[in-house]
């Protein structure tokens, strides 16, 4: 799946724990680009030195790719049965266990492979923090720090120009990242997918702030935020309404509505992939290491 902070820290912890416990009796195979590498047999024999100096590195030394779970049972353009190919390569490599790092789709595929008889240890990775079985996923806290820093920086220009600013935070279906960053950054309004918003309430809050002498407002908006009107539609119509939106994202629609209702200049900032890039923070380095050590012990 998508990259995030803490992947290399987790990989490092798995490897170093195995080397410390088993020494030369362990052989670690790196699967290139995630499930894609396991499907097409793209691997790399790893050495202890491959794991040095990567604790603080963002991204992943093994690469990654998106292999949607819903397509795992669908043969590819070359008629390759992906599940059977992964099982075949697992056995061909002589693996004792497959260690998987990923979010919802990755976890579903990991469980599918388990049901097919493979030994799998799967660790929770996502900046969305939306996986069952753990309070925190690695990558989440680092993304919170970055999104919070964006909100902090926007505050100064918002106050200087007397504008409304919308910071669009990653999160199509869940609002953990937006909620945490919004609270930490002191956002005046926070909109998340789980709670459909009422644009009239948003406008009322902004007007109330203006009447109270506040010439600016900061909104933290999840990319998956949705209005009450659209949320009330049947699923098929709801998807069509979102697809037909004339703006690049929901934040621009909200900005238009605010500007039209208040007359106050409204701007949108989209930090995008900045949120999942760069070095993991201290918390993610620790939790990634703990996850990796436990995976090796299992």
Task: Give residue spans per PLM region.
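Short, ordered loop/turn segments at secondary-structure junctions
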Residues: 1-2, 31-36, 66-67, 103-106, ...
């Amino acid at each position: 799946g998508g990259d995030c902070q803490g992947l290399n820290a987790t990989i490092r912890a798995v490897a170093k724990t195995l080397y410390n416990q088993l020494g030369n009796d362990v052989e670690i195979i790196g699967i290139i680009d995630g499930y894609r590498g396991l499907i097409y047999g793209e691997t790399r024999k790893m050495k202890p030195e491959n794991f040095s100096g990567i604790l603080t590195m963002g991204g992943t030394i093994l690469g990654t790719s998106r292999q949607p779970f819903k397509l795992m049972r669908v043969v590819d353009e070359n008629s390759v049965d992906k599940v059977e190919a992964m099982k075949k390569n697992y056995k061909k490599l002589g693996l004792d266990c497959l260690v998987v790092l990923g979010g919802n789709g990755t976890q579903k595929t990991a469980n599918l492979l388990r049901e097919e008889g493979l030994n799998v240890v799967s660790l929770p990775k996502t900046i969305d923090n939306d996986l069952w079985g753990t309070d925190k996923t690695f990558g989440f806290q680092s993304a919170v720090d970055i999104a919070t820093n964006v909100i902090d920086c926007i505050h100064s220009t918002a106050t200087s120009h007397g504008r409304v600013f919308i910071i669009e935070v990653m999160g199509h279906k869940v609002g953990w990242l937006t909620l945490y960053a919004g609270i930490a950054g002191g956002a005046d309004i926070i909109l998340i997918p789980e709670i459909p918003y009422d644009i009239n309430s948003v406008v009322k809050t902004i007007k109330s702030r203006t009447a109270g002498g506040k010439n600016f407002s900061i909104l933290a908006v999840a990319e998956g935020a949705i209005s009450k009107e659209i949320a009330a539609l049947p699923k098929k119509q709801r998807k069509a309404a979102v697809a037909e939106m004339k703006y690049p994202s929901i934040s621009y629609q909200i900005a238009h509505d605010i500007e039209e209702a208040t007359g106050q200049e409204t701007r949108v900032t989209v930090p995008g992939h900045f949120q999942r890039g760069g070095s993991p923070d201290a918390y993610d380095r620790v939790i990634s290491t703990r996850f990796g050590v436990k995976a090796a012990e299992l």
